Amino acid sequence: MERYESLFAQLKERKEGAFVPFVTLGDPGIEQSLKIIDTLIEAGADALELGIPFSDPLADGPTIQNATLRAFAAGVTPAQCFEMLALIRQKHPTIPIGLLMYANLVFNKGIDEFYAQCEKVGVDSVLVADVPIEESAPFRQAALRHNVAPIFICPPNADDDLLRQIASYGRGYTYLLSRAGVTGAENRAALPLNHLVAKLKEYNAAPPLQGFGISAPDQVKAAIDAGAAGAISGSAIVKIIEQHINEPEKMLAALKVFVQPMKAATRS
C-alpha cells in the first residue's frame, strides 16, 4: 500500500503523472507474460494493473476477454498467477502492483485468505470490479487487515454521497472511469472529468487515475491536465499482444514503442 504513496510523492516532485498499463497475467503464456511485464516497466510504466484470468469477465470488452481466453488456453491457473506475482515483486521491489479482480475469484479462496496471499506475494492493491461500494465492507476490511489498498471505481455520474464513500473507503488510488460501459480502446475516453477530480480532492480521496478507453498520449495528457494523477491503459496494450501473438520479440518491441510516448505524455 505504501508503494503508491511513495510513487505519487516522487512523481509530484518530478512534476509527472503516472502511466499505468493493464495486462492479463499469463497472456499469452506464463513465460512471455513475464517478459511483457518486464518490458512495460523498462519502457516507463510507473505501476502495474494486472488481471487474473476469469471465466466471466463482466466489465471487460472483447479485447480483454480474448486475453483471458489465451491465458486459459495456456492452462494458466490463479495459483500460477500468484507465483508470477511473487516473481514480479522479487524482480521489481518498488513498483506498485494492483490486481483487477472479480468477486468469485476472491470467494473461491475465502476473502481473508485471498488478501493474506496478496500480502504475502507483495500485491499493493485490489480492485474487485463486480462488488459495488455498498457491499464492499468484507473485502475492504480484509484488504486493510493485510495492508492491501482497496480500490474503488468512480463513475462519471457519481453523486456526492458516492464520492464521499470512495474518498473514505479507498486507499492507494481512485479508479476514475472515463465513461460508463465496458473497457476498450475503440471507445475513446470522453471529456476530462474536472468536476469529479475537484470533488475527490476536496474529500481527500486517494489520487485519481483515469482509465477506460485510454489509447493515445494526448488522452494521457488530457487526463493529467484535468487534474488526474495519471492514466491507466489496458485494451490498447492487450491489442498489441494480440496483433503479434506469433512474434514474441516483435510484440515486446511494439509494446515499448507504445508505452514510451504514453509515459512521455505524463511529463508537464
Curated annotation (Swiss-Prot):
Note the PROSITE patterns from the entry: TRP_SYNTHASE_ALPHA
Please tell me whether the keyword Amino-acid biosynthesis is annotated for this protein: yes
Q: Name one GO cellular component term.
A: cytosol
Question: Which reaction does this enzyme catalyse, per its entry?
Answer: (1S,2R)-1-C-(indol-3-yl)glycerol 3-phosphate + L-serine = D-glyceraldehyde 3-phosphate + L-tryptophan + H2O
- Which GO-annotated molecular functions does the record name? tryptophan synthase activity
A Pfam family recorded for this sequence: Trp_syntA
Q: In which pathway does it act?
A: Amino-acid biosynthesis; L-tryptophan biosynthesis; L-tryptophan from chorismate: step 5/5
- Keywords annotated in UniProt: Amino-acid biosynthesis, Aromatic amino acid biosynthesis, Lyase, Tryptophan biosynthesis
> EC annotation?
4.2.1.20
Active-site residues, record numbering mapped to chain: 49 (proton acceptor), 60 (proton acceptor)
Concerning InterPro entries, the annotation shows: Aldolase_TIM, RibuloseP-bd_barrel, Trp_synthase_alpha_AS, Trp_synthase_suA
Q: How does it assemble?
A: Tetramer of two alpha and two beta chains.
Family (UniProt): Belongs to the TrpA family.
HAMAP family documented for this protein? Trp_synth_alpha
Functionally, this protein is described as follows: The alpha subunit is responsible for the aldol cleavage of indoleglycerol phosphate to indole and glyceraldehyde 3-phosphate.
Protein known as: Tryptophan synthase alpha chain
Q: Origin organism of this chain?
A: Escherichia coli (strain SE11)
Q: What is the lineage of its organism?
A: Bacteria, Pseudomonadati, Pseudomonadota, Gammaproteobacteria, Enterobacterales
